[in-house]
From Swiss-Prot:
EC number(s) per entry: 2.3.2.27
Recorded GO CC terms: cytoplasm; cytosol; endoplasmic reticulum; endoplasmic reticulum membrane; endosome; late endosome membrane; lysosomal membrane; nuclear inner membrane
Domain of life of the organism encoding this protein: Eukaryota
Record's bilayer topology term: Single-pass type I membrane protein
GO molecular function (one): JUN kinase binding
Keyword Heme recorded: no
Primary residence: endoplasmic reticulum
Protein name from the UniProt record: E3 ubiquitin-protein ligase RNF13
UniProtKB keywords: Endoplasmic reticulum, Endosome, Glycoprotein, Lysosome, Membrane, Metal-binding, Nucleus, Signal, Transferase, Transmembrane, Transmembrane helix, Ubl conjugation, Ubl conjugation pathway, Zinc, Zinc-finger
Species this protein is from: Rattus norvegicus (Rat)
Gene: Rnf13
Length: 380
C-alpha cells in the first residue's frame, strides 16, 4: 500500500509539474494585443496590430465593425468634426487620431462627444505600441467608447486604402482575454490536490518510519529482562567496547544474549534509542515472545549480509548462555559424559558375563517304576 501511495505521489508530482508548465505557457501565449481587420472597396483585407487602452469600455466579443474617418483636427485635443450626418444613424464610425499635443483620455473623450463609437490613436515617427492610460478619474468616468493604439506605418496604410472616403471599412477585433477565474480556479484546485497528496504521503512516511524505528528498538520492559552483573576482579570482561573504559569493582554490566557485556549507562541508550543489536557483533537482542511476529521484518533485514555483518558470529550455544555460565556448563557436560561412559562400561561387562553363563536345561524322563529320571543336558 505504501508503495502504491509512493507511486501515486510520483504521478501527482509529475502531473502538477506538467500542468503548471502548460498553464504558464498558455498564459504567455494569450495575446495581449488586438487586431484591426481592414477591407477596401475590392474586399481585399489586411490585418494591423494594435494595443487596447487601459480605460474606456472593452470591445465586444464579436468585434466592432465601422467606417474609418480621419480626425479633424488630427490630434483631437479639441472638439473634432462629427461623422457624416446622413450615415450617422445607420452606420458605425471610427475615428483615426494622431498622438501628441494632449493626453490620450482627452482625445478619446472628444471623439466620444463627436459621436464616434471607437477611436484609433496612432504613433508618430514610430511603430511602437503604447498602452494608453489616464490619471484623471473624472475624465475616465466619462469615457464609454473603446480605443486602441497603432503604429505610424499602420496608420498610413489605413489612410491610403481603407478609409470611409475610399470605400473601405474596418473591424476592431478584441483581444482574447479570459476571466481570471477561468484559469485561476482550476489551477488552485490542482495545487490543492497536489498539496493534499503530499501531506498524505509525508504523514504515511512519518508513521512508517516511526513504526520501523520503534520495532527496531528495545522497549524498557524488554531491557529489564536482560541480566545485570556487578563486575568483580577476575571476570573475563575488562573494557567496555562503547566508552573504552576499564571495568571497576561494582560497575553494573548489562549482559547481552551474545555474552558481550557493557556498562549499563552505555548500552541501554543504544538498545532503547538506536537499535536492539549488539554494538560489536551486531547480533539481535532476543525479544520477548509477544514481539516475535512484529519483529519478523526486522530480523529478515538483519539476517542479510552487509558491511556491518561480523565475519565470525557467535555460536548458537553462546547466544543462549549468559555471563559466567560457559565454564559451569562445560564442567557439567564433562561430568555427564564420564557418567555415561561408566554406565556403558558396566553394561558391556554385564553383557559379556551373560554370554559366558551356561544355559542349563533339565530333561525329565519317566522310568518304568514311575520315578522320574533327571538328566541334565549342558548346552553352550
Amino acid at each position: 500500500m505504501l508503495l502504491s501511495i509512493g507511486m501515486l505521489m510520483l504521478s501527482a508530482t509529475q502531473v502538477y509539474t506538467i500542468l503548471t508548465v502548460q498553464l504558464f505557457a498558455f498564459l504567455n501565449l494569450l495575446p495581449v494585443e488586438a487586431d484591426i481587420l481592414a477591407y477596401n472597396f475590392e474586399n481585399a483585407s489586411q490585418t494591423f496590430e494594435d494595443l487596447p487602452a487601459r480605460f474606456g469600455y472593452r470591445l465586444p466579443a464579436e468585434g466592432l465593425k465601422g467606417f474609418l474617418i480621419n480626425s479633424k483636427p488630427e490630434n483631437a485635443c479639441e472638439p473634432i468634426v462629427p461623422p457624416p450626418l446622413k450615415d450617422n444613424s445607420s452606420g458605425t464610425f471610427i475615428v483615426l487620431i494622431r498622438r501628441l499635443d494632449c493626453n490620450f483620455d482627452i482625445k478619446v473623450l472628444n471623439a466620444q462627444r463627436a459621436g464616434y463609437k471607437a477611436a484609433i490613436v496612432h504613433n508618430v515617427d514610430s511603430d511602437d505600441l503604447i498602452s494608453m492610460g489616464s490619471n484623471d478619474i473624472d475624465i475616465l468616468k466619462k469615457i464609454d467608447i473603446p480605443s486602441v493604439f497603432i503604429g505610424e506605418s499602420s496608420a498610413n496604410s489605413l489612410k491610403d486604402e481603407f478609409t470611409y472616403e475610399k470605400g473601405g471599412h474596418v473591424i476592431l477585433v478584441p483581444e482574447l482575454s479570459l476571466p481570471l477565474e477561468y484559469y485561476l480556479i482550476p489551477f488552485l484546485i490542482i495545487v490543492g490536490i497536489c498539496l493534499i497528496l503530499i501531506v498524505i504521503f509525508m504523514i504515511t512516511k512519518f508513521v512508517q518510519d516511526r513504526h520501523r524505528n520503534r520495532r527496531n528498538r528495545l522497549r524498557k520492559d524488554q531491557l529489564k529482562k536482560l541480566p545485570v552483573h556487578k563486575f568483580k576482579k577476575g571476570d573475563e570482561y575488562d573494557v567496555c567496547a562503547i566508552c573504552l573504559e576499564e571495568y571497576e569493582d561494582g560497575d553494573k554490566l548489562r549482559i547481552l544474549p551474545c555474552s558481550h557485556a557493557y556498562h549499563c549507562k552505555c548500552v541501554d541508550p543504544w538498545l532503547t534509542k538506536t537499535k536492539k543489536t549488539c554494538p560489536v557483533c551486531k547480533q539481535k537482542v532476543v525479544p520477548s515472545q509477544g514481539d516475535s511476529d512484529s519483529d519478523t521484518d526486522s530480523s529478515q533485514e538483519e539476517n542479510q549480509v552487509s558491511e556491518h555483518t561480523p565475519l565470525l558470529p557467535p555460536s548458537a550455544s553462546a547466544r543462549t548462555q549468559s555471563f559466567g555460565s560457559l565454564s559451569e556448563s562445560h564442567s557439567h557436560h564433562m561430568t555427564e559424559s564420564s557418567d555415561y561412559e561408566d554406565d556403558d562400561n558396566e553394561e558391556t561387562d554385564s553383557s559379556d558375563a551373560d554370554n559366558e553363563i551356561t544355559d542349563h536345561s533339565v530333561v525329565v524322563q519317566l522310568q518304568p517304576n514311575g520315578e522320574p529320571d533327571y538328566n541334565i543336558a549342558n548346552t553352550v
